[in-house]
């Protein structure tokens, strides 16, 4: 969790400059996870950066971290039956329903624009998905246009 704290502290001034609050809600204090720390930092940085980019002024970007049991739905065959779940939620512009299937698909490429006309290509998310997969985790999202998005990833606890 200290890893997530550090990334949040780096992004707080950026969020504040856009009148966005960046907050952490953690249900854990310490988890011993054998992972590529720089990879995890990259994933968290990308998800927070995107959330800030696509959030409206005077909203909150929330980072939630917890440990959960691995269920059949999200089983990877790795770890001890537990995984860390990180969720980055925003109340931004959301993703159009017709674009949601394209976002994590390597075969498609499209350009999006944030709330301040900042450009996004989705390539960072593809890299995040690849990084997480290589660590036996998953990355997925839910989104509603005009409401916001939740980007989630898991890493098994070893």
Where are the regions a protein language model picked out?
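Glycine-rich ATP-lid/hinge loop adjacent to the conserved G-boxes
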Residues: 108-119
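Glycine-rich G1-box
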Residues: 13, 93-94
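Short alpha-helical Gxxx[C/S/T] motif in the catalytic ATP-binding
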Residues: 119, 124, 128
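Short helix-loop "hinge" at the ATP-lid/N-box region of the Bergerat-fold HATPase_c
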Residues: 51-52
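Glycine-rich ATP-binding loops of the HATPase_c
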Residues: 136-142
């Amino acid at each position: 969790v200290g890893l997530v704290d550090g990334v949040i502290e780096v992004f707080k001034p950026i969020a504040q400059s856009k009148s966005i609050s960046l907050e952490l809600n953690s249900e854990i204090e310490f988890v011993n996870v054998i992972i590529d720390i720089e990879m995890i930092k990259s994933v968290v940085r990308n998800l927070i950066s995107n959330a800030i980019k696509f959030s409206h002024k005077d909203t909150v970007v929330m980072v939630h971290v917890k440990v959960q049991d691995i269920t059949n739905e999200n089983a990877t065959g790795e770890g001890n039956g537990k995984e860390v779940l990180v969720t980055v939620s925003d109340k931004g512009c959301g993703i159009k329903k017709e674009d949601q299937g394209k976002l994590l698909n390597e075969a498609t490429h499209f350009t999006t624009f944030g709330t301040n006309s900042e450009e996004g290509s989705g390539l960072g998310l593809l890299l995040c998905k690849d990084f997480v997969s290589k660590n036996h985790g998953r990355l997925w999202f839910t989104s509603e246009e005009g409401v916001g998005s939740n980007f989630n990833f898991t890493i098994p606890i070893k």
